[in-house]
Amino acid sequence: MILRTFLTTVLLASLLFGCGGSDPESLDGRAAEIDGGECSGGNGKSVTIYSGRTENLINPVLEAFACETGTDVQVRWGSSINLALLLNEEGSKTQADVFLSRSPGPVGYLESKDLLGQIGEDVLSLVDEQNHSAAGTWVGFSGRKRVLVYNTDEFSPETLPDSVFDLTDPKFKGKVAIPGTNGSFVDWFTVFIDQYGEETATQWLNDIVDNDAKYYPNNRSIVEAAGRGEISMGLVNHYYNYQEVAANPDTHKALNYSFNDNDIGSLLVITAATKLASSENDEAAEDLLAYLLTAPVQQYFTDRTFEYPLAAGVVPNAALPALTALEIGSVDFDKLGGGFEEASRIVEASGILNR
């Protein structure tokens, strides 16, 4: 099964960021954009993070946190889904203090297993009420909008559909890519089920698979494939294409397209952070969660990774479109944990993973 495969491949990496030494050091690269000062000496604290966020996106933030606070940081990288399954298997014996998820579903799954601790009100109050769980067990720290990325040589905006439901039309046969095992896609599909019912959601997925949809393992692989013309379009998070355009402006031939404002295909999905109930490093865990919502880190997320900031007072990158999509406040993300496993089962049963 997927968990067994994961356990043989993921490694626990200790990130030594100049903490605890007698001579303070400074950061370079993207981490220096968050904290440009000298690193603190070791403070005696440590925190172990299981991160479903991609290493190249979140690692500069963790480096800056370790540098600024002097906290010893250890990280285990993996997919949000697999890490959530691993945490459930480890239970109270886990080394993890903090779990960073690409989306709320895996966090909701852990909440349903009573594995999450209570986050302090001083951290929860840094975001709007709809951006943390009602029970106070997770907090959002950035937002990603679901979009359709498309190859500009093959399509123009006026030829694209108004709704994600229209992708089952025969004129899009063999042209749509889906990241079926990706955590944010599974979360999105869980909301789809919640909004429209299991029968309608399952029928849509089966219809799009019957329309010869193609499977890719993640958002980035779809964006790259669309940019080189390997696939015509695909369902992804918005920020991957911004990053690809910034890195390869002359060769990448893909743009984002938003469905109608209230379409389920334009859902805003948030990244979520939580701490484990079994954590013995509660103070360091709270420090990290609060750090994710500081202005420099939130600015980094929107300026460098093109995500939507969630902390009050931080202005989104001017390149990002206004958030007129299906708003997160209209979706009860606390329900995602309960539907997470069922949504994954429906995705697997659809046959998309064999495409």
Q: Locations of the language-model features?
A:
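Ligand-binding pocket segment of bilobal, Venus flytrap-like solute-binding proteins
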Residues: 181, 185-187, 191-260
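Bacterial signal peptide processing site
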Residues: 20-23
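C-terminal motif of bacterial Sec signal peptides marking the signal peptidase cleavage site
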Residues: 15-18
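Early extracytoplasmic/lumenal segment of secretory-pathway proteins
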Residues: 25-109
